[in-house]
Amino acid sequence: MCIRDRGTALEDGLVLDATIAASEAQRQALWDVRETAPESHKMSAGVARSDISLPQSALAPFYDEMVTGIRAIDPNLWICGYGHIGDGNLHFNLIADEKSNVDFDSKKKDLYELLYEKVAKYNGSISAEHGIGQTKRAQLAKVKSPEILDVMRAIKASIDPKNLMNPGKVI
């Protein structure tokens, strides 16, 4: 999104609060905050990470519904969302502190189910930049149609008809 678009988004009321760098030093300081966020999560009592994408028009309602759902599961979780919002890519991470760390691992299943349900509702993707991997493979069938899954298999078969390259992996 260019500077003009940011100004328009602010003027049109699409953005209610923003920090826009006025200098190169401020731009770098903002970028440093974004770059150090994943490292800071390691110091928390627990984290549930995600890398999703959504249509831009769905970002605000998705976020609002997620906050409501997350608070019902654990009101003490910290929500850390950042990413390439102009592209609809969002790192939506849930961070446990000492209050929410009790059985956090058992809560992760419910948190991820909520996340994937909302991503599917808004026609998003459960993986924006980092692929499906083994951890999201079971969720793929819940958020993609059988036709899309067939196309994905056909693409893999056309590249690797003998299934020699990364057998069982998703393209």
What are these regions (language model features)?
Residues 4-107, 114, 118, 122:
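C-terminal substrate-recognition/cap domain of FAD-linked oxidoreductases
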Residues 18, 81, 128, 165-166:
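General beta-strand structural signal in soluble alpha/beta enzymes
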Residues 19-32, 127-142:
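Short proline/glycine- and acidic-rich turn/helix-capping motifs at secondary-structure junctions
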Residues 56, 60, 109, 142-149:
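Electropositive phosphate-/nucleotide-binding environments in soluble metabolic enzymes
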Residues 85-90, 126, 133-135, 170:
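Gly/Ser/Thr-rich beta-alpha loop segments that engage phosphate groups in nucleotides
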Residues 120-132, 161-165:
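Alpha-helix capping/hinge segments and adjacent helical runs
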Residues 137-171:
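Activity-critical C-terminal alpha-helical subdomain
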